[in-house]
Amino acid sequence: YRKDARDPKYNTRLTINSAKGAAMMLRRSAIDRVGTFDEDFFIYFEETDLCHKLWLAGYKVIYEPLSVVYHYEAVDTHKQMRNSFIMYLSYRNRIASYLKNLSVPSILRLFPVLCLFYFFSCALYPTAVLRALVWNIWMFPKTMNKRRLVQRGRKLDDTTLFQTIWRDPPLIYYYYLFKSLKFYRHEPSLVETNHY
């Protein structure tokens, strides 16, 4: 996203957690199965939510370096909206997505981390955090209906999913991201673990 496509780190096919909505292609069968973007999200975290549902339904999300995307028009939302509104949408949608997509044990494990995250976020965007929490309380029945649909179609458990998206790209990718990436593709552990 907004980087030089000729950079070596972008020339490796990778299984990824989420694709950008403006540069995403989906199988029709996947759309028929999991649906499209959540209509209640408006913007922010909508493609991550969709990709999470795809993973749970048994699909993979893959970054393909040979693809070419022409993004005809873009709007800088930071110029169009106040930061507090942007953060509100981001917090709001993130909470709703976790409630819909994560298993109950994963939600319980993540809950203390989220509480800490939102506690510190309150220092910067108190209104945004409060509005996000109120919205999710108000929308809780609707979110639970969506959750039932997602969980009914689940084919992948959270443990397997997290191992996949944390392993691929593997940790060494991030090492090369901050160091020299020219040898990344020749890393033996990557060649052995990436099977597409």
Label each residue range with its predicted role.
Residues 7-10, 35, 70-80:
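Short glycine/proline- and charge-enriched loop/turn segments
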Residues 45-49, 88-93, 127, 131:
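A structural signal for well-ordered alpha-helical segments within the folded catalytic domains
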Residues 97-98:
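Short alpha-helical functional segments enriched in proximate histidine and acidic residues
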Residues 105-196:
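Non-catalytic, C-terminal membrane-associated alpha-helical segments of glycosyltransferases
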